[in-house]
Amino acid sequence: MLAVLLISGIAHGMAQEVLTLEKALEIAFQNSPSLIQSKISLERSQMNLKAQEASLKSQFSLSVNPFNYSRQNSYDDYNSQWYINQNMSSSASLGITQPIKWTDGTVSLVNDFSWQDASNKTSGKTNTTFRHNLSLRLNQPIFTYNQTKMQLKELEYALENAQLSYALKQLNIEKSVTDQFYSVYQRQKDLSIAKDEYQNQKQNYDIIKNKVEAGLVAKEELYQAEVNLASSESSVYSQEISYENVKDNFKLLLGISLDEDIAVIPNTDIVPVEVNPIEAVKHALDQRMELRQQEITLEQDQFSIIRAKATNEFKGSISANVGMNAFDSNVKNVYDKPTDNEQIGISLSIPIFDWGARKARVKSAELAHESNQISFDEEKKQIILDVRSICRNLPTLLSQI
């Protein structure tokens, strides 16, 4: 059995890649599936924010209807005869819309131009019209929250949260790789010790066997040596299995082929650094990214409360429209007698009774905020406990190294 393991180890050693901790971390950062997914999520958040910021710039639109034709037969009951109406038209509309981030309103400049030719085949009458309409329009919500600014702020928080998640994922990968790197090294040393022990037991067995054959010791000692040798061989087999299992898990974490054989070389030259527990706790509370993520969640809860309060709320909008309307049967005379158009209006939405739906939604959002606040406080306590525990264990860990 041991011979098979040794031959297998030699075969693997021919194509073995030796990894340092730095090289293992570099491979993990490049190949880790979870880190790649986190980076994709970060890029998505960046694109969402970029799209929202682009939507706040002037939007240009062009609508063209090159040609439209219709023919309709109509019956006049009074004159008891049929009329054939024929209509041809063409139109184009150019619009420029500018959102107003500070007020959540929009300003639009719309330029419409159309041509229409209508004829009655029965009477022989024809009417041709060229029309140009230029208007400036304003739409402004009132008595409600600014949805545009809130959406932009939410996307900024989402991007910051994605950046924090990516950084945390990197730290988790670094910790996991470091832990498993030294686990592989530990199993590697355990296997080496087990093989050395096997060689010692084999030599001891050969010595006792020679002594038994020479009649210098009793046969019982040979039996005990055989038991010790078999136990040592079994230990080598167990350590070999444990070593291969740990290596497979490590290769899976690094994102490399499971068929590739590896070995690790750690750096055991550790420079001790004195840690002040009080300063360590203070630094952790200031820098831990998990706490910032919790703070972002609390800010997003405030947005949820605002939206809940806006359900069935009293709100309104102001709309205004000024422009010029010009038309004529001859395109050259369209602007001879233009007319001015002005329009302004206020609309209000007044809720009367909603059976308590708005109140329940607000209460639900407030309870969610309260729950997340408790989670935030508990996270701070847990961080303090973890840092204190690590500081207490540092002398023990240093002695183990």
Tell what function each PLM region has.
Residues 64-136, 264-276, 306, 319-350:
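Small/polar, glycine/serine/threonine/aspartate-rich low-complexity segments that form flexible
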Residues 1-19:
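Bacterial Sec-dependent N-terminal signal peptides
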Residues 37-52, 169, 173-194, 210, ...:
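Amphipathic alpha-helical coiled-coil segments
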Residues 153-159, 163-283, 393, 397-400:
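Periplasmic alpha-helical coiled-coil/stalk elements that build and connect Gram-negative outer-membrane
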Residues 15-89, 150, 154-156, 264-299, ...:
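Bacterial Sec-pathway N-terminal export signals of envelope proteins
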Residues 313-317, 341-343, 389-391, 398:
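Active-site lining segments that contact anionic ligands and/or coordinate catalytic metals
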